[in-house]
């Protein structure tokens, strides 16, 4: 749990310092199929821990964010293809993933 706090704090700081260079509305990439971290409720809205963290980061940066969902297997390629601006996922860091994206 302590590591997650450090990761989310680092993400908040990184996003906060770069917010001025970003669009007014950011696209938050999320899987939405891994409860309780992320999933869809009965109305089709994305909910869960990852979504709450993403919303808190956006509020802290004072920017509007929209949610873009992606299948897990395509989430890193979608980020690299700029289908969303940042990724919120309870994802373990592996050498393969570190080679593809930056973690904060």
Task: Specify the residue positions occupied by each region the protein language model found.
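Bacterial N-terminal signal peptides that target proteins for export
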Residues: 1-9
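Ser/Thr-centric signal marking residues that sit
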Residues: 14, 25, 104
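Sec/Tat signal peptide C-region and signal peptidase I cleavage site
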Residues: 17-23
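Hydrophobic helical h-region of N-terminal Sec-dependent signal peptides
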Residues: 9-17
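Extracytoplasmic small-molecule ligand-binding "clamshell" domains
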Residues: 24-91
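Ligand-binding "clamshell"
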Residues: 83, 96-104
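General helical secondary-structure elements
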Residues: 1-2, 23, 93
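General helical structural elements
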Residues: 9-10, 44, 101
